[in-house]
Amino acid sequence: MIFKVFYQENADEVPVREKTKTLYIEAESERDVRRKLQDRSINIEYIQPLEGAHLEYEKQSPNFQVLEISS
């Protein structure tokens, strides 16, 4: 399944909505997403599963690129 992760680049700063970034990652579950990203110093705000029409909509974005991290 593909997940959309909303995050802040600096885990030490207070989250500011205007600085929120996104990435797409393939994983089995939300827990698997967190495990795959644990070595990065980012502040994960929200993890959203993408499927069906929502996934197709996201694929139309020029920023849609699935991050590949091995388990």
Curated annotation (Swiss-Prot):
Pfam families: RpoY. The keyword Methyltransferase does not apply. Gene3D superfamilies: RNAP, epsilon subunit-like. Keywords: DNA-directed RNA polymerase, Nucleotidyltransferase, Transcription, Transferase. InterPro entries: RpoY. Its EC number is 2.7.7.6. One of its GO terms (cellular component) is DNA-directed RNA polymerase complex. One of its GO terms (molecular function) is DNA-directed RNA polymerase activity. One of its GO terms (biological process) is DNA-templated transcription. It catalyses: RNA(n) + a ribonucleoside 5'-triphosphate = RNA(n+1) + diphosphate. HAMAP family: RNApol_bact_RpoY. RNAP is composed of a core of 2 alpha, a beta and a beta' subunit. The core is associated with a delta subunit, and at least one of epsilon or omega. When a sigma factor is associated with the core the holoenzyme is formed, which can initiate transcription. Belongs to the RNA polymerase subunit epsilon family. A non-essential component of RNA polymerase (RNAP). This is DNA-directed RNA polymerase subunit epsilon.
